[in-house]
């Protein structure tokens, strides 16, 4: 929160309230963040613990987990996002009213986690929707999620009405729904463009919070080699020993050629 004038604090103690529309508006939103009752995998167990009496999230106004996206302000993406579930996540996000926020909880929701190179796991929910706060861990403890909620409140305190995206103002306004991905021949697609291909290829995403428009590359962690799995894609060539992830090229190539098992 921005620094407050000591004279203003003294007047408030005497019952005289001096404020701005921004401060009053942000105070109302930060004090009533209603999460959506929405869990994907094991991180959701920690999210349930976060909502119990031990951590007392009622003091932040976030104890009301809503069953409908129409009544929710916050989506906590808790756990692994499979490519089959990804379109439903985007649909739920589009049904939430602005202002709406997203917390990416855990390594899987943020980057795919230990399943990053799998054929069925989305490598980060920010490929499809903007994320406000990331929570590392596998799984994160409830205290980490509580810290993420406090971090989100700090972000809300710094917002200005003339710059928020839901009023169509600012550098990159968002006034339409986010496109729902569909299944293509090699992965998730949006308008025919491959978003998260199978086989460890580079990632391209138009949505990376908070700037809404940067590109994200899947080669950041492994700049020297693009990891691919030949046993999943017959068209992949064994150009690097690490691509087979410990399997000899002969065995991997034999797996590609393996056809139906004979009855002999």
Swiss-Prot record:
Keywords: 4Fe-4S, Cell membrane, Iron, Iron-sulfur, Membrane, Metal-binding, NAD, Quinone, Translocase, Transport, Ubiquinone. Its main location: membrane. It is a peripheral membrane protein. It is found in: Cell membrane. Transmembrane segments: none annotated. It catalyses: a quinone + NADH + 5 H(+)(in) = a quinol + NAD(+) + 4 H(+)(out). Gene3D superfamilies: 3.40.50.12280. Binds 1 [4Fe-4S] cluster. GO terms for biological process: aerobic respiration; electron transport coupled proton transport. Signal peptide: none annotated. NDH-1 is composed of 14 different subunits. Subunits NuoB, C, D, E, F, and G constitute the peripheral sector of the complex. PANTHER family: NADH DEHYDROGENASE, NADH-QUINONE OXIDOREDUCTASE SUBUNIT B 2. NDH-1 shuttles electrons from NADH, via FMN and iron-sulfur (Fe-S) centers, to quinones in the respiratory chain. The immediate electron acceptor for the enzyme in this species is believed to be ubiquinone. Couples the redox reaction to proton translocation (for every two electrons transferred, four hydrogen ions are translocated across the cytoplasmic membrane), and thus conserves the redox energy in a proton gradient. This is NADH-quinone oxidoreductase subunit B 2.
């Amino acid at each position: 929160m921005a620094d407050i004038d000591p004279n203003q604090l003294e007047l408030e103690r005497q019952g005289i309230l001096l404020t701005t529309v921004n401060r009053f508006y942000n105070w109302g939103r930060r004090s009533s963040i209603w999460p959506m009752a929405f869990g994907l995998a094991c991180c959701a167990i920690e999210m349930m613990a976060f909502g119990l009496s031990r951590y007392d999230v009622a003091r932040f106004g976030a104890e009301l987990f809503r069953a409908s996206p129409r009544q929710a302000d916050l989506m906590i993406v808790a756990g692994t996002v499979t490519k089959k579930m990804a379109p439903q996540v985007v649909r739920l996000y589009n049904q939430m009213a602005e202002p709406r926020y997203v917390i990416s909880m855990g390594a899987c929701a943020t980057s795919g986690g230990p399943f990053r190179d799998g054929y069925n796991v989305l490598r980060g929910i920010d490929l499809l929707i903007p994320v406000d706060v990331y929570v590392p861990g596998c799984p994160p403890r409830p205290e980490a999620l509580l810290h993420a909620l406090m971090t989100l409140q700090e972000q809300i305190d710094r917002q200005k009405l003339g710059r928020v995206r839901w009023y169509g103002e600012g550098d990159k306004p968002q006034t339409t729904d986010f496109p729902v991905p569909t299944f293509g021949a090699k992965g998730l697609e949006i308008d025919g463009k491959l978003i998260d291909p199978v086989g460890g290829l580079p990632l391209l995403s138009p949505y990376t919070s908070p700037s809404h428009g940067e590109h994200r590359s899947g080669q950041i962690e492994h700049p020297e080699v693009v990891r691919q799995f030949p046993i999943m894609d017959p068209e992949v060539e064994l150009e690097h020993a690490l691509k087979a992830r410990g399997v000899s090229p002969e065995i991997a190539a034999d797996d590609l050629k393996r056809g139906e098992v004979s009855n002999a």
